[in-house]
């Protein structure tokens, strides 16, 4: 709709640029290298340019009103309201999420500090400073000495978050990241992608050896966030520049396109190294845990833009809410990518998140259980 509303303006701008280019090239031979950015043109001539932009769609609307055929009048009405529509669409986005007050901030920081103890306790020398997948507390304490690319990526980002919350110093952050990256660089990989599971005590890949597309995407997104965050603390601890370079090198070595089905424009679920075959299934829904991986792949040009359009947006309705569906409807599928991908209000992804919460709460109320069902149940 926005493109249609701006059609007269775009046509006029293109025609004007063409005429000026021909005039300067063949007649005046002057100002052929002049170029003014849109921001500068708005700053130096805001009133005149704004008036011209508003006037041209209105002029087209008036002319089309006198057209002899009815469809033209429809476009006339559309162009008539184009200036208002375009102005509203240009307003800067403002979030309605309120910041926690001082008391809530203290509670959240205390909870984060308690969660952080998981990494300080179990990312130890025995585990090669890699995060165990899980720890059983009862009836006996038992550590699962295995880890995945997602676990490792989240651990790296948790280190950065701990520094953001002043739970650790920049020097401690550097030390922890160096130790973990030392181990990651020793892990066997496939086309640069980490395998699905590793033994944290031996650093060997666990059988059956498998490369997960989603795990690879999660790891790459975590490395991207880590790299950006480290630039804030590197001036305090220059060694963090080297850590950042190592993270960037790991990211650059990963080839997601090796997991892409170019015929169907979808990502395979993964690659089985034991059988040397791709999995039969593919990630074909937008609202799934693979959304973050798909976004990264398109942004890094490891997958074409049409891949994003190939992801299905199957819709559903319940209790006045409408949203896109996931395969199993878990919180993990909907909200895991939200850790890194912003969902703005009145967008498809934002409405899908609201729809997920509504359905989860409705189901929990019927079954008299807490809401928030995820992969763990």
Regions found by a protein language model. Give the residues of each.
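Short acidic (Asp/Glu) and glycine-rich catalytic loops that position anionic groups and cofactors
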Residues: 1, 38-41, 93-97, 315-317
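Juxtamembrane/interface segments at transmembrane-helix termini
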Residues: 13-31, 72-74, 81-102
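Ser/Thr/Asn(+Pro)-rich, low-complexity disordered segments
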Residues: 46-55, 70, 74, 78, ...
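Alpha-helical bilayer-embedded segments of polytopic membrane proteins, i.e.
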Residues: 1-15, 37-86
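Membrane-proximal soluble regions of multi-pass membrane proteins
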Residues: 1-40, 106, 110-118
């Amino acid at each position: 709709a926005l493109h249609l509303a701006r059609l007269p303006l775009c046509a006029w701008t293109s025609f004007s640029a063409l005429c000026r280019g021909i005039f300067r090239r063949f007649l005046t031979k002057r100002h052929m290298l002049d170029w003014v950015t849109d921001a500068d043109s708005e700053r130096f001539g805001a009133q005149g340019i704004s008036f011209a932009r508003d006037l041209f769609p209105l002029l087209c609307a008036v002319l089309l009103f006198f057209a002899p055929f009815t469809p033209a009048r429809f476009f006339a009405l559309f162009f008539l309201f184009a200036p208002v529509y375009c102005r509203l669409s240009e307003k800067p986005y403002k979030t309605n999420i309120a910041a926690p007050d001082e008391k809530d901030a203290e509670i959240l920081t205390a909870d984060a500090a308690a969660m952080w103890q998981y990494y300080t306790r179990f990312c130890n020398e025995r585990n090669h400073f890699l995060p165990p997948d899980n720890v059983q507390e009862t009836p006996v304490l038992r550590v699962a000495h295995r880890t995945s690319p997602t676990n490792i990526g989240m651990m790296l980002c948790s280190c950065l978050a701990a520094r953001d919350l002043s739970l650790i110093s920049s020097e401690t952050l550097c030390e922890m990241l160096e130790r973990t990256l030392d181990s990651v660089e020793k892990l066997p990989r496939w086309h640069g992608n980490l395998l699905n599971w590793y033994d944290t005590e031996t650093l060997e890949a666990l059988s059956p050896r498998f490369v997960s597309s989603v795990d690879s995407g999660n790891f790459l997104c975590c490395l991207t966030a880590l790299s950006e965050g480290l630039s804030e603390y590197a001036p305090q601890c220059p060694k963090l520049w080297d850590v950042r370079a190592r993270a960037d090198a790991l990211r650059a070595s990963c080839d997601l396109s090796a997991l892409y089905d170019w015929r169907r424009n979808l990502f395979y679920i993964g690659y089985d190294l034991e059988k040397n075959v791709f999995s039969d299934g593919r990630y074909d829904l937008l609202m799934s845990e693979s959304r973050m991986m798909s976004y990264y792949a398109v942004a890094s040009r490891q997958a074409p833009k049409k891949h994003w359009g190939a992801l299905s947006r199957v819709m559903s309705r319940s209790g006045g809410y409408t949203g896109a569906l996931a395969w199993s409807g878990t919180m993990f599928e909907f909200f895991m990518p939200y850790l890194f991908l912003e969902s703005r209000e009145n967008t498809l992804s934002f409405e899908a998140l609201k729809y997920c919460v509504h359905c989860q709460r409705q189901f929990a109320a019927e079954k008299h259980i807490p809401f928030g069902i995820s992969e763990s149940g």
